[in-house]
């Protein structure tokens, strides 16, 4: 079999782009908690001493956005000005409009309902909030049915935050990045080739101490021992110093970590970000649905790995296309898989919202460490409750 290397990265909750994602989703959750029917498209920018929250929000409730912003920043760990950012003293500017009535026209009553193909009751009168294509992916190379490189990179990033917040490594600060290179023998992951960890730190700690502690307290508890060998390479803060970080080191924007949020580059991406968007936005809800479909198909044993593309037109409820690719691992024909998908999954926006119960404040917890393959939180699109019926109908 051919040997190949594949690399994926993750970032911690203190990374500037992830601060922005978490603020956008914290605002979304605060609104959905009071008004499940709200329309939210919330974008955030963070830089030294400043948070800017912009977007289109249509809701019947009131949310104190600056308060939500400050609470989120404090939870992440930016609580002192010497960290380069402080949730209590940073400026918060908001500029919020209502959703465009032209967009609302297409979303409120889907085109099929207007043309009489279906009743409002059947589709709950929600068309797609935008055109676009979304991808879902699953593979049986890990128990959570995710690609191993992104799965391990997320675990390292989450562990970095754990040892910082528990003060096991009290000199760590919130910003950080991880990267994992996995060696494959054909399609099977066999070892970890390279690990990169960059973490913000107190100025008075030595590079040698950081390297020793990160390998001992972050890498070893997280990466399975059988994947590491004497040839595995470790790069810990390879520039030698990472004191200035967070929004002081780099500006951050919502939606700038879409590959970290999904499959680490192993699958294709339609380009739409998730955070700050209510579930009528198919960028988010249809990507979740595509993952749900893909995971259930792999869990059913119909394929070892699968990529699914869904595509939508604004104001139209039914997907304009559904594509599957099993990379030669399918036990039945791809066309038959598409038939099963159409039969067992309602992929109209209203159907997705109902199927996955998406009008709830569940989004902030997804805004760091990945939206898929999460084993630390219960997400509806990660359930495999349709695997058995799919297996039976596939004749396996």
From Swiss-Prot:
State the residue spans of region: Flexible loop.
99-109
Q: Tell me the residue numbers annotated for binding L-methionine.
A: 56, 99, 250, 281
Q: Which reaction does it catalyse?
A: L-methionine + ATP + H2O = S-adenosyl-L-methionine + phosphate + diphosphate
Q: Which UniProt keywords apply?
A: ATP-binding, Cytoplasm, Magnesium, Metal-binding, Nucleotide-binding, One-carbon metabolism, Potassium, Transferase
Chief location: cytoplasm
Cofactor details (free text): Binds 2 divalent ions per subunit. Binds 1 potassium ion per subunit.
Record: residues binding Mg(2+): 17
Example of a GO MF term: ATP binding
Recorded hits in InterPro entries, A to Z, give:
ADOMET_SYNTHASE_CS (IPR022631), S-AdoMet_synt_C (IPR022630), S-AdoMet_synt_central (IPR022629), S-AdoMet_synt_N (IPR022628), S-AdoMet_synthetase (IPR002133), S-AdoMet_synthetase_sfam (IPR022636)
| Any one annotated GO CC term | cytoplasm
Q: Name one Pfam family in it.
A: S-AdoMet_synt_N
User: Can you say where in the cell this protein is located?
Assistant: Cytoplasm
Residues annotated for K(+) binding in this entry: 43
Which pathway does the database say it acts in?
Answer: Amino-acid biosynthesis; S-adenosyl-L-methionine biosynthesis; S-adenosyl-L-methionine from L-methionine: step 1/1
Residues bound to ATP are 15, 175-177, 241-242, 250, 256-257, 273, 277
The reply on keyword DNA damage is no
Keyword Metal-binding assigned: yes
Q: Name one GO biological process term.
A: one-carbon metabolic process
Function, in words:
Catalyzes the formation of S-adenosylmethionine (AdoMet) from methionine and ATP. The overall synthetic reaction is composed of two sequential steps, AdoMet formation and the subsequent tripolyphosphate hydrolysis which occurs prior to release of AdoMet from the enzyme.
Quaternary structure and interacting proteins, as annotated:
Homotetramer; dimer of dimers.
What's this protein's family per the entry? Answer: Belongs to the AdoMet synthase family.
Its recorded name reads: S-adenosylmethionine synthase
What species does this protein belong to?
Carboxydothermus hydrogenoformans (strain ATCC BAA-161 / DSM 6008 / Z-2901)
Taxonomic classification, please?
Bacteria, Bacillati, Bacillota, Clostridia, Thermoanaerobacterales
Q: Give me the gene this protein comes from.
A: metK
């Amino acid at each position: 079999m051919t040997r190949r290397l594949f690399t994926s990265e993750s970032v911690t909750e203190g990374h500037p782009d992830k601060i922005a994602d978490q603020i956008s989703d914290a605002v979304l959750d605060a609104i959905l908690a009071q008004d499940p029917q709200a329309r939210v498209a919330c974008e955030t920018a963070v830089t030294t001493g400043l948070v800017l929250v912009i977007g289109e929000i249509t809701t019947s409730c009131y949310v104190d956005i600056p308060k939500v912003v400050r609470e989120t920043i404090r939870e992440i760990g930016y609580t002192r000005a010497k960290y380069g950012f402080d949730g209590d003293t940073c400026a918060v500017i908001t500029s919020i409009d209502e959703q465009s009535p032209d967009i609302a026209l297409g979303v409120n009553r889907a085109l099929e309902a207007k043309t009489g193909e279906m009743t409002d009751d059947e589709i709950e009168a929600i068309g797609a909030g935008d055109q676009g294509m979304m991808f879902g992916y699953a593979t049986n190379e890990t128990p959570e049915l995710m690609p191993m490189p992104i799965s391990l990179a997320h675990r390292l990033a989450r562990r970095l935050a754990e040892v910082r917040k528990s003060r096991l490594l009290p000199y760590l600060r919130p910003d950080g990045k991880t990267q994992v290179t996995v060696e494959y023998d054909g399609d099977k992951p066999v070892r970890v080739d390279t690990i990169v960890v960059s973490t913000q730190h107190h100025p008075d700690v030595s590079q040698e101490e950081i390297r020793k502690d990160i390998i001992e307290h972050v890498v070893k508890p997280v990466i399975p021992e059988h994947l590491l060998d004497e040839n595995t390479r470790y790069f810990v803060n390879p520039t030698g110093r990472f004191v200035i970080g967070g929004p002081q080191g780099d500006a951050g924007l919502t939606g700038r970590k879409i590959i970290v949020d999904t499959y680490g580059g192993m699958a294709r991406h339609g380009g739409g970000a998730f955070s700050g968007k209510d579930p009528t936005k198919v960028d988010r809800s249809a990507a979740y649905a595509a993952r749900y479909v893909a995971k259930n198909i792999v869990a059913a044993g119909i394929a070892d790995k699968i990529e699914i593309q869904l595509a939508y037109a604004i104001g139209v409820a039914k997907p304009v296309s559904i594509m599957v690719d099993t990379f030669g691992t399918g036990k039945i024909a791809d066309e038959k898989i598409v038939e099963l998908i159409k039969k067992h999954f309602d992929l109209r926006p209203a159907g997705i919202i109902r199927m996955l119960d998406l009008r709830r404040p569940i989004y902030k917890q997804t805004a760091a460490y990945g939206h898929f393959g999460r084993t630390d939180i219960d997400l509806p699109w990660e359930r495999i409750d349709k695997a058995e019926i799919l297996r039976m109908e596939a004749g396996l």
